[in-house]
Amino acid sequence: MMKKLISLFLLSCFLFSCGQAQKTDKQIIQETMQAIEVPKQYKQEPAYYVGIYSANIKWELFVNDVQMFAHYQGKITSPIVPLNYRILGSGKQKITFRIYPPNEQAVLGKYASFRMRLYYRKNFRDKEIPEIHILNFELPYEQTKDLPYFEKSFEFEAEVPYQMTGWTKSKDLTKVPDLEQKVVKKIEALRTILENKDTEAYFQAVMPKLKEKFICLYATQQEIENYFQEYSLTSGEFSKIFDDIQILPIEDYQIILEPNNRLVKLRQKNGDSFTDGIKFKAIVKEDKKETTGNYLFRFHIPEGSDELEVIR
């Protein structure tokens, strides 16, 4: 009798474990695709950009009072930054640059250099259509060389075929008394997901931001599917580039509110620089050298909720 009970117990355990078999990446992506509404495709899909050249400074770029890009190393850089990610709909837009001295320097100095050009393309997929100039700016040397900080804002009109909610219906986070605890708790939960390489939970956590991201980038069904394949925690691009990915603990952090007070992120000190979000270290497969990186998360609290949600 006892042997029969043991056999039945072992059989039930086996059947349960089979029933709980881990989903494959293909299954996860198929199920995730079903939860995504593929954005409408338009005849004209305008895209806005800012091209920047800088040297011997640190700087931050904000679009509509939400950080879009940052350069904290002080070295020469020349990125082309797409802006649609912060453009919620047609109408007046604002871009702001905050410029700081390089490490251990009190003022911007005589070697500070910053140039930018703002432009757009009527249809970003058609590279034959020339870019359309909006404005240029160059850091005025004589007026700024002795300044410890410089900020400049510009407004421009954008026309896009979509309209998104974004952070327009988010709570004012300055009125949330336990904001730091909420952010740290959310970051720790995301750290656990990353450590466990739980792709399904990761996609679920970032789904609110992805839905709007795909809209403003005019993503096709194939592009969306490619995105999920690329960002799988088990078989995506990171796993092809890195070995021994280790999610690092949260240390020496501060809570950063975006200027609109609707978005928040966690920033960690990283030597003379900063890292936003969750840090990791890994071994580069190609040269076997150790490197570091990060997963950036911003949060908001939608109206009618008390819970933080990942946002663009």
Tell where the protein language model's regions lie, with residue ranges:
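Solenoid-repeat scaffolds in large eukaryotic assemblies
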Residues: 201-205
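N-terminal post-signal-peptidase region of extra-cytosolic proteins
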Residues: 75-82
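Short strand-turn-strand beta-turns centered on an Asx-Gly dipeptide
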Residues: 58-74
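Beta-strand-rich interaction surfaces with strong enrichment in secreted/lumenal proteins
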Residues: 68-70, 82-87, 103
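Sec-dependent N-terminal signal peptides
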Residues: 5-14
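Short, well-structured beta-strand segments within conserved domains
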Residues: 89-100
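Beta-strand-rich recognition domains
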Residues: 22-59, 99-196, 207-312
